[in-house]
């Protein structure tokens, strides 16, 4: 499986501000002046930059793709990250009306569906999309978002073929006899779902918009531990710091420290922290990643156990498992 991240922000899109951009430019110039010599290359300077300057984590809301070994495409959620995905797809078979893809929706809060009206392949005749979710009225919800009073082109009037499939708990959904999909419900206002994708012996879990806290993790693990256990890759909600998670109790999101605990307890191989808080700058996200790595290492040392490889979700990040 090839997993690619197209949108990693939570709640609402977060463009880089002019002030943040100027601070980056200042940092780059200062680093260049401090380390300049006739033998110093541009690449050398870039390597010296702090991660929050050299990397743009991304401001688009949630969208992730899974591509199977057979080339089948699954699209997880339709935040604003769906727009650049669509721009890429129309340079390929979608531009000729030859794309078939499966959507899977965790839930329909705006940051997980707001990119759909701007998904260009949706408007091209011949393309086919299967919309999968446990949500009974998913079609109605997506159609309502594009009512003429809100958007100039209604969802049902787009030119692609659209099919809807309601998933059932404890019943696996299979794509082309190779990619097996399961789901479980999560704790989040209005409800949400985690998806597990399996191909051969490999497994990937997408679990955004969930509030794991305290002893609830133990009870959840006892009920659903097999779902998460030993995944090759887990992308998990980690929107808040621990202090902010306490201040926003019942808002439906997890702290980065609790996300790390979950990854360790479930013995996953790779853990990706995602659904970044929109008010957090890239500098703060870099700091959170460092703190999460420190927490991970301390846990490993204290318990003498193997821990997951840790990543901070970044637009354009790709995993091959």
Protein language model annotation of sequence segments:
Residues 203, 213-308:
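Cap/insert and terminal regions of metallo-dependent hydrolase folds
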Residues 76, 106, 206-208, 236-238, ...:
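Active-site flanking residues adjacent to catalytic metal/cofactor-binding acidic residues
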Residues 1-205, 214-215, 225-226, 282-321:
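Binuclear metal-dependent hydrolase catalytic cores
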């Amino acid at each position: 499986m090839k997993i690619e991240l197209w949108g990693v922000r939570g709640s609402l899109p977060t463009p880089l501000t002019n002030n943040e951009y100027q601070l980056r430019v200042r940092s780059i110039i200062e680093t260049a002046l401090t380390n300049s010599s006739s033998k110093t290359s541009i690449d050398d300077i870039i390597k010296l930059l702090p991660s929050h300057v050299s990397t743009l984590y991304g401001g688009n809301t949630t969208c992730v793709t899974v591509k199977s070994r057979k080339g089948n495409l699954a699209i997880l959620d339709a935040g604003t990250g769906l727009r650049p995905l669509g721009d890429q797809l129309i340079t390929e078979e979608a531009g000729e009306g030859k794309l078939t893809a499966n959507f899977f929706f965790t839930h329909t809060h705006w940051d997980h569906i707001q990119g759909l009206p701007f998904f260009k392949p949706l408007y091209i005749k011949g393309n086919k999309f299967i919309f999968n979710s446990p949500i009974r009225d998913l079609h109605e919800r997506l159609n309502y978002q594009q009512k003429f009073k809100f958007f100039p082109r209604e969802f049902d009037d787009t030119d692609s073929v659209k099919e809807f499939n309601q998933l059932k708990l404890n019943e696996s959904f299979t794509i082309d006899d190779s990619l097996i999909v399961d789901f479980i419900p999560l704790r989040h206002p209005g409800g949400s779902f985690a998806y597990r994708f399996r191909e051969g012996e490999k497994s990937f879990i997408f679990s955004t918009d969930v509030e794991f806290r305290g002893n609830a993790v133990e009870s959840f693990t006892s009920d659903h531990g097999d779902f998460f256990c030993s995944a090759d890759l887990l992308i998990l909600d980690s929107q808040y710091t621990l202090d902010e998670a306490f201040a926003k109790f019942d808002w439906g999101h997890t702290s980065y420290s609790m996300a790390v605990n979950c990854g360790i307890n479930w013995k996953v191989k790779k853990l990706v922290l995602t659904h970044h808080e929109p008010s957090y700058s890239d500098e703060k996200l870099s700091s959170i990643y460092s703190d999460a790595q420190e927490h991970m290492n301390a846990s490993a040392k204290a318990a003498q156990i193997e821990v997951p490889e840790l990543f901070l979700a970044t637009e354009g990040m790709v995993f091959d498992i």
